[in-house]
UniProtKB/Swiss-Prot annotation:
One of its GO terms (cellular component) is cell junction. It comes from Anopheles gambiae. This is Alpha-actinin, sarcomeric. Ca(2+) binds at D789, N791, T793, R795, E800. InterPro entries: Actinin_actin-bd_CS, CH_dom, CH_dom_sf, EF-hand-dom_pair, EF-hand_Ca_insen, EF_Hand_1_Ca_BS, EF_hand_dom, Spectrin/alpha-actinin. Homodimer; antiparallel. The gene is Actn. Disulfide bonds: none annotated.
């Protein structure tokens, strides 16, 4: 697997080796130095095989792109024939060929991940190197086997064995261990000492060592130069794959050529001219050494198995000897807990302690059989264990152990069942006794309690019901007490180990049961007597409550009526109050009788409570009222009656005086009010301009003004009467509908109307004279205005104003343009946006429309004449043509002219003129 190269290779049957490969590939990304080494090494390795087919490659990422040489390489190294390649040059032909090669690799049990034909065809160097490395692993390294180690570990062990005798060589890996070249030289010298004089090599000269090894391997061993000495020396950590590839060539060269009589061996001797006898001796020595090592290793393993058997047998037999007494013991403390503890110990023994011994016995038998088989196969005599440790001895001891286990377990289960039955009976006794004692807790104290002597009647009845329920419960518990006694008797019969405590507890329960019966009867008698006394007191309390509640309500109502702070405004009201008070006084006799009955009920209850000494007997549960409260309220009511008589008499005199003031005010107001209304109607008629000229209207208005001021003393006299009415707090007067406020408002409105109408008439005269309109025109305008002033308010709403204009012949369209024109007219007649049009504004607008008036355009034309048709005017021209004060007025208010061709001091008369008529922002 190669993460940085983007591929994963795995072979079936070599999972351990491929897992190691995965670990190698996790170290990091493929750096440029390693990539360069791999490219050079893999290219040389491929060429070493391709030359057998008469071809080679120059650039590994390009020459395999069409897939042809890749398929040829696989055929050479596998000795098998691949499918016929596609000969086209199109991309899909190349992909098809590469896929055939990849399929062949996969058929050899190699799992390819992330390696696709497209990457190889595209010349992806990392993918190509990864693919070649996968091929090298499968066809050059995987089959290496040294002492049950395969692939990388086998190749590394082979290197270590071969180089062990050599100085300065310590092969631990496939990168740094080969960096100085001595390991390569040692491998060659070990197999071909005639090719290298190892004693002359130095660790301090790695370049010479590497060149020597590579040259000798290429010249005499037919191993091409796959590594560059400079790259190995200058790289801190040379590429492991490149070195493994090169070292695997050494392995195949030496292992394939070492067999005497083999064709490669004979050809090799022929090429080198060396002695055949020399290599036979060399091979024989190595074979003899290997045979001795193998025999010694077998003998050592057999001795180890014998020692282990003796140790395991002794340990197992000793454990059985220690365990048997415990299994044969039948001692018990006759308690269920003790037997259950023994049973749990036995289960722990079966669960934790025995399983390892079962495994130990099985291992012992397996080791014995294995040992005997190995001895037989190696022609050794059979193994005889020491006395008492034969397999049969162990089997017999084991059977005895299992028999003891079975008997011990059966005894434990039987004893457990017996004690469980007895313990169940004891637990049943305990449970029933506990339940009974829990039920009886507090019962004696409850029955001896005198709590009912401090109870009210309802509480006492509840206690009596509760006691009746307890008596029923007591009768129901009689069966439980009998069951407890029966169980105790049975435990005694069965000789329960703790019978003493059972009997003592049973006796306590029976004694307590007798006491509870006596106390129950005594408490019932006490409850009955207390109920009789409280019922008698309760009847008195109930009667008191029935009478006291309505009487108390009557007292509260009477007291409220007597102290009521009444407010009256008429004689009828005060007379009604006096009549109601007289009726109340007539009921006081019956009330006094009821009061005496109520107080008598309380005294009777007090006598019984004192005689029977009933705690809390004076507390009435039916009411919160008391005799003292009723007595106090009755005394208060009797004292308030004469006070109420005096208050009503005083109020009667006050109302008689108020009636006189009402009549005086009404007489005067009924005269003033109509007079003000008549004057207001006359002034309004004049203001409407219905008849007469403006001068006549003005004359009549001034006459009315004099008459109104002459009537003012009557108003002042009415104010004095009103002041007296206010001081007497009189707010209503049935003799007149006029109030002082309405008369004041009417008087002020009259004065205001006269002044306003005088001002309007004077303004109309001024407008008529200045505009030159005739009396007929003025009358027409007034008539139209009055016609649409439906409410006679002296003003028109916008819609009324619009209708008035239309009636006078003013054209206003009903389209959007007409609405815009009307809004402009409204802005003129109602500049403050009050929502109404006064007659003065209406008249001013109509006179503008019907007469020739000055406009902003006329003023602009006049200024243009003074300025000689220029768009601006100079201050000197204004001073020359206008009076001095008016000239200075214009100069101060005219803005500077900012148009084209302006000269210093030029003034803008156009903006000034439009501002005079409110048509600009100036």
């Amino acid at each position: 697997m190669m993460e940085n190269g983007g591929y994963v290779g795995q072979y079936g049957g070599e999972e351990n080796y491929m897992e190691q490969e995965e670990e190698w590939e996790r170290e990091g990304l493929l750096d440029p130095a390693w990539e360069k080494q791999q490219k050079k090494t893999f290219t040389a390795w491929c060429n070493s095989h391709l030359r057998k087919a008469g071809t080679s490659i120059e650039n590994i990422e390009d020459d395999f792109r069409n897939g042809l040489k890749l398929m040829l390489l696989l055929e050479v190294i596998s000795g098998e024939t691949l499918p016929k390649p596609d000969r086209g040059k199109m991309r899909f032909h190349k992909i098809a060929n590469v896929n055939k090669a990849l399929d062949f690799i996969a058929s050899k049990g190699v799992k390819l991940v992330s390696i696709g034909a497209e990457e190889i065809v595209d010349g992806n160097l990392k993918m190509t190197l990864g693919m070649i490395w996968t091929i090298i692993l499968r066809f050059a390294i995987q089959d290496i086997s040294v002492e049950e180690m395969t692939a990388k570990e086998g190749l590394l062990l082979w290197c270590q064995r071969k180089t062990a005798p050599y100085k300065n060589v310590n092969v631990q890996n496939f990168h740094l261990s080969f960096k100085d070249g001595l390991a390569f030289c040692a491998l060659i010298h070990r197999h071909r000492p005639d090719l290298i004089d190892y004693s002359k090599l130095s660790k301090d000269n790695p370049l010479e060592n590497l060149n020597t090894a590579f040259d000798v391997a290429e010249k005499y061993l037919d191993i091409p130069r796959m590594l560059d000495p400079d790259d190995l020396i200058n790289t801190p950590k040379p590429d492991e794959r490149a070195i493994m590839t090169y070292v695997s060539c050494y392995y195949h060269a030496f292992q394939g050529a070492q067999q005497p009589g083999s064709t490669p061996f004979v050809i090799h001797l022929t090429k080198t001219g060396l002695s055949y006898r020399f290599f036979v001796r060399l091979f024989a020595a190595e074979t003899a050494a290997n045979r001795i090592c193998k025999v010694l290793k077998v003998n050592q393993e057999n001795e180890r198995l014998m020692e282990e058997y003796e140790r395991l047998a002794s340990d197992l037999l000793e454990w059985i000897r220690r365990t048997m007494p415990w299994l044969n013991s039948r001692q018990s403390d006759s308690t269920l807990a003790g037997v259950q503890k023994k049973l749990e110990e036995y289960r722990t023994y079966r669960r934790k302690h025995k399983p390892p011994r079962v495994e130990q016995k099985a291992k012992l038998e397996t080791n014995f059989n294995t040992l005997q088989t190995k001895l037989r196969l190696s022609n050794r005599p059979a193994y005889m264990p020491t006395e008492g440790k034969m397999v049969s001895d162990i089997t017999n001891s084991w059977k005895g152990l299992e028999h003891a286990e079975k008997a011990f377990e059966e005894w434990l289960l039987a004893e457990t069942m017996r004690l469980e039955r007895l313990e169940h009976l004891a637990q049943k006794f305990k449970h029933k006794a506990d339940t009974h004692e829990d039920w009886t807790k507090g019962k004696e104290e409850m029955l001896q309690s005198q709590d009912f002597r401090n109870c009210k009647l309802n509480e006492l009845k509840a206690l009596k019901k509760k006691h009746e329920a307890f008596e029923s419960d007591l009768a129901a518990h009689q069966d439980r007490v009998e069951q407890i006694a029966a169980i105790a008797q049975e435990l005694n019969t069965l000789e329960y180990h703790d019978c003493a405590s059972v009997n003592a507890r049973c006796q306590r329960i029976c004694d307590q049961w007798d006491r509870l019966g006596a106390l129950t009867q005594r408490r019932r008698q006490g409850l009955d007597e207390a109920e009789r006394i409280l019922e008698k007191i309760d009847l008195l309390h109930l009667e008191f409550a029935k009478r006291a509640a309505p009487f108390n309500n009557w007292l509260d109502g009477a007291r409220e009526d007597l102290v009521d702070m009444f407010i009256v405004h008429t004689m009828e009201e005060i007379q009604g109050l006096i009549q109601a008070h007289d009726q109340f006084k007539a009921t006081l006799g019956e009330a006094d009788k009821e009061f005496n009955v109520i107080i008598g009920l309380v005294r009777d209850a007090e006598a019984i409570v004192k005689q029977e000494q009933v705690p809390g007997g004076l507390v009435n549960p039916y009411t919160t009222l008391s005799a003292d409260l009723i007595s106090r309220k009755w005394s208060e009511v009797r004292a308030l009656v004469p006070q109420r008589d005096q208050t009503l008499a005083n109020e009667l005199r006050k109302q008689q005086n108020n009636e006189m003031l009402r009549r005086q005010f009404a007489e005067k107001a009924n005269a003033v009010g109509p007079w003000i209304e008549r004057q207001m109607d006359a002034v309004t008629a004049i203001g409407m301009g219905i008849s007469g000229s403006l001068e006549e209207q003005l004359h009549r208005l001034k006459e009315y003004e004099q008459a109104v001021y002459a009537y003012k003393p009557s108003i002042e006299e009415l104010e004095k009467i009103h002041q007296a009415v206010q001081e007497s707090m009189i707010f209503e007067n049935r003799y007149t509908h006029y109030t002082m406020e309405t008369l004041r408002v009417g008087w002020e409105q009259l004065l205001t109307s006269i002044n306003r109408n005088i001002n309007e008439v004077e303004n109309q005269i001024l407008t008529r004279d200045s505009k030159g309109i005739t009396q007929e025109q003025l009358t027409e305008f007034r008539s139209s205005f009055n016609h649409f002033d439906k409410n006679r308010t002296g003003r028109l709403a916008p819609e009324e104003f619009k209708s008035c204009l239309v009636s006078l012949g003013y054209s206003i369209g009903k389209d959007k343009q007409g609405d815009m024109d009307f809004q402009r007219i409204l802005a003129v007649v109602d500049p403050n946006a009050s929502g109404y049009v006064q007659f003065d504004a209406f008249l001013d607008f109509m006179t503008r429309e019907s007469t020739d008036t000055d406009t902003a355009e006329q003023v602009i034309d006049s200024f243009r004449i003074l300025a000689s048709d220029r768009p601006y005017i100079l201050p000197d021209e204004l001073r020359r043509e206008l009076p001095p004060d008016q000239a200075e007025y214009c100069i101060q208010r005219m803005p500077p002219y900012k148009g084209p061709n302006a000269i210093p001091g030029a003034l803008d008369y156009m903006s000034f003129s439009t501002a005079l008529y409110g048509e600009s922002d100036l």
